[in-house]
């Protein structure tokens, strides 16, 4: 009985300390970026796409995290990246296709909550169809995007 009481008191003290710590957060322990603080910028060379860097720097070595916002009816053209990229769909449906010929009708829908991995050096294209899509992309920089078919020729 005494051992049970001692355990209960110990657990109560530990839980009480955890709650006290959570209530008075130590600044600098967690970096928080609220959605209303995100400064979206136009993605160079891809009208209709905006992005924000949340962590790291994609052009430098190391981990980076970005979000990209695709306006309705906006898709990238066939391209590849030198690094693996890990993509989580945050909002809407994101459409992904593979190959050097741009064929939006052959893309696969990835709804909000879905996940995809871009394999380094593999050609793909992606974007939004009828609704806005927001994706979060992470990888190890330096990142790059190499367009394969700059003219964006469609499948005939």
Where are these regions (language model features)?
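Glycine- and acidic-residue-biased ligand/ion/polar-headgroup-sensing regions
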Residues: 71-74, 80-101
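Conserved short histidine dyad/triad with adjacent acidic residue
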Residues: 61-81, 109-110, 119-120
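Short beta-strand His + acidic residue motifs that chelate non-heme Fe in jelly-roll/DSBH
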Residues: 76-78, 96-97, 118, 123-129
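Soluble periplasmic/extracytoplasmic beta-strand elements of cell-envelope proteins
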Residues: 53, 69, 95, 134-138
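A short, N-terminal "cap"/entry segment at the start of jelly-roll beta-barrel domains
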Residues: 18-64, 151-156
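Bacterial N-terminal signal peptides
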Residues: 3-16
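Double-stranded beta-helix
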Residues: 28-31, 105, 125-156
